[in-house]
Amino acid sequence: MAAANRTLMVMAGGTGGHVYPALAVAETLRERGWSVFWLGTRAGLEARVVPAAGIDMVWVSMGGVRGKGLVKKLLLPAMLLVAFAQSLGAILRRRPDVVLGMGGYTAFPGGMMASLLNRPLVVHEQNSVGGLTNRLLACLADRVLTAFPAVFTHAHDKPIPCRRVSAEWVGNPVRGDITAAPAGERAARSGPLRLLVVGGSLGASALNELVPRALALLPEAQRPRVVHQSGRRHVDALRAGYAAAAVDAEVRDYIDDMAAAYRDCDFAICRAGAMTVAELACAGVPALLVPFPFAVDDHQTGNAAFLAEAGAAWLVQQKDLSAEALAELIAGIDRNRLAAMSEQAVRLAKPDATGRVADICEALAK
């Protein structure tokens, strides 16, 4: 079958951790001549970024119920019936050659209907702990791919309602412009260390509050040069916080060119979302990882442990991190140590993840 006649249905929704890796694969397959359409909701991030990328959307009426009230849970059967019908209609109309599910509750009805109609189904799990949708769909999938090793087999992982799944560790698709700095470049730098602080697109209040106070405890000669992404809601407050601490810092509400930000920094302080961890590894950036304490199934701790256990990062839980402890850690950092950590990060990276997932989709279409 010619690539120009192949069609991919993507199912990923809700957050950037699901949407952006799926978008990377979708764009790669479009470059190879595939037609792509996307199953999503109007409430998720996909409603904004997927049409902007020129990909057709098929809307489904699906919402999560975890942490919701009783009424929402009682309405789940009716909501699923509607979403199943919408997904079934999309598959019958568009007749995709391969269906790619990359998490989020939106993927569940589409994945179930793809299996019912005997469409090749690929499931990719971005986190170190399998999400509910992917745990269910993994039992039906033709190929199960993971961003971290041993997902669905960890003792701490959630059970799956079938025999043990055979999963393949392919890594997390990241943007192609995120690559490691040339070997030895960071160790050869002189002057103050360069610190990048990132709390995600919305910022991280705990990091915004803690980092300025920690840097204020250091002698001025030991302070790194700081670029701090605050999140749009926190930019003014964070600038005031650095000013009150008498610490010079470049505060940005959002960093458009993360590839350049990674290349320019010596180390980072950030959360441990799946995309962040994958990007740090590909960019070879040592990091202090502070997992978001309220992440579903505490998956950010597992994500962070992947780098920390290999000596590529420090892992500190938010409840254990104080300004004093952070200042002590920063004071003990030197370029040789950072260079060694950077090498470890690069060894763990899977920079070809996007192409690998695309290759697997193509193989199933033959």
Curated annotation (Swiss-Prot):
SUPFAM superfamilies in UniProt: UDP-Glycosyltransferase/glycogen phosphorylase
Gene3D superfamilies reported in the protein's UniProt record: Glycogen Phosphorylase B (3.40.50.2000)
Keywords, ordered alphabetically: Cell cycle, Cell division, Cell inner membrane, Cell membrane, Cell shape, Cell wall biogenesis/degradation, Glycosyltransferase, Membrane, Peptidoglycan synthesis, Transferase
TM region(s), chain numbering: none
Catalyzed chemical reaction(s): di-trans,octa-cis-undecaprenyl diphospho-N-acetyl-alpha-D-muramoyl-L-alanyl-D-glutamyl-meso-2,6-diaminopimeloyl-D-alanyl-D-alanine + UDP-N-acetyl-alpha-D-glucosamine = di-trans,octa-cis-undecaprenyl diphospho-[N-acetyl-alpha-D-glucosaminyl-(1->4)]-N-acetyl-alpha-D-muramoyl-L-alanyl-D-glutamyl-meso-2,6-diaminopimeloyl-D-alanyl-D-alanine + UDP + H(+)
Annotated binding of UDP-N-acetyl-alpha-D-glucosamine, by residue: T15, G16, G17, N127, R175, S201, I255, Q300
Protein's membrane topology: Peripheral membrane protein
EC number annotated for this UniProt entry: 2.4.1.227
GO molecular function, one term: undecaprenyldiphospho-muramoylpentapeptide beta-N-acetylglucosaminyltransferase activity
Coarse class of the protein's main subcellular location: membrane
GO CC annotation terms, alphabetical: plasma membrane
Compartments (UniProt record): Cell inner membrane
Pathway noted in the entry: Cell wall biogenesis; peptidoglycan biosynthesis
Function description: Cell wall formation. Catalyzes the transfer of a GlcNAc subunit on undecaprenyl-pyrophosphoryl-MurNAc-pentapeptide (lipid intermediate I) to form undecaprenyl-pyrophosphoryl-MurNAc-(pentapeptide)GlcNAc (lipid intermediate II).
Name of the protein this chain belongs to: UDP-N-acetylglucosamine--N-acetylmuramyl-(pentapeptide) pyrophosphoryl-undecaprenol N-acetylglucosamine transferase
Native organism taxonomy: Bacteria, Pseudomonadati, Pseudomonadota, Betaproteobacteria, Nitrosomonadales
Gene encoding the protein: murG
